């Protein structure tokens, strides 16, 4: 896919989950897509189990619903600078404790995954602003449906897509969100993929710039990531 960046030599992105990036096996288009106490307690556990399954990429098509851009409203910061300056080292070490990669291997993996020169993203209404050290670009975006992605591992993800309707010429024609949710709900972090080729963006599996609320400190982000 094209790697041309709307902001200098920006690396473009595509599909994936937050903590792992399984190889993409294929994708499928979708929509442009009574007693209380004990029973309630069991119901709560059932809902928790379902939410966890969805987070891991296991869900029914019937559970998927369109989402508005307002789910990602706000000011967001890239994780990439925190990886580069060592703030995320405790996270890399924690992943190594329960996985088959060393902390150094994890850091190299995420160095590719998080890589981007877009340090800030602001989403207000239907307007998205991309800020890097060298440029600020703004576009107005409208929903262009969603795509269901199937990974080699067998789990799936839903990519929510928005198309530019007006704005700076160099602002990307498409932006695609992935945040482990499949129905309307405010995001607490997300991967954002952007570029000018809608279909090609779905094939990228190595670079997935990841954003957390701009108001969080590096230490707060580390604590949140370690809690998952």
Label each PLM-derived region with a short phrase:
Residues 88-141:
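N-terminal glycine/threonine-rich, aromatic-flanked beta-hairpin/loop signature
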Residues 80-83, 127, 132-134, 145, ...:
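A mature extracytoplasmic/lumenal domain signature
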Residues 141-216:
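A charged, solvent-exposed segment within the mature domains of Sec-exported extracytoplasmic proteins
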Residues 52-60, 103-104, 111-113, 141-145, ...:
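Short amphipathic alpha-helical surface micro-motifs
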Residues 2-8, 14, 22-77, 81-103, ...:
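Amphipathic/hydrophobic helical signal segments and adjacent flexible N-terminal regions
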Residues 75, 124-129, 156-160:
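Short, hydrophobic/aromatic-rich segments at coil-to-beta transitions
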């Amino acid at each position: 896919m094209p790697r041309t960046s709307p902001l200098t030599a920006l690396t473009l992105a595509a599909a994936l989950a937050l903590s792992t990036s399984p190889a993409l096996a294929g994708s499928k288009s979708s929509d442009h897509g009574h007693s209380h106490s004990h029973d309630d307690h069991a119901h709560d556990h059932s809902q928790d189990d379902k939410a966890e399954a969805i987070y891991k990429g296991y869900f029914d098509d019937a559970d998927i619903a369109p989402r508005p851009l307002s789910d990602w409203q706000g000011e967001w910061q890239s994780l990439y600078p925190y990886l580069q300056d060592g703030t995320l080292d405790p996270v890399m070490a924690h992943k190594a404790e329960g996985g088959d990669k060393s902390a150094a291997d994890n850091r190299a993996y995420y160095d590719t995954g998080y890589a981007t020169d877009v340090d800030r993203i602001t989403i207000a209404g239907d307007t998205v602003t991309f800020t890097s050290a060298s440029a600020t670009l703004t576009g107005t975006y409208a929903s262009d449906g969603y795509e269901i992605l199937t990974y080699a591992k067998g789990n799936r993800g839903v990519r929510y897509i928005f198309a530019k309707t007006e704005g700076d010429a160099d602002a990307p024609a498409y932006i695609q969100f992935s945040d482990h949710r499949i129905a309307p709900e405010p995001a607490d972090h997300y991967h954002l993929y952007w570029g000018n080729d809608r279909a090609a963006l779905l094939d990228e599996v190595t670079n997935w710039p990841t954003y957390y609320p701009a108001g969080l400190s590096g230490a707060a982000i580390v604590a949140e990531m370690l809690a998952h």
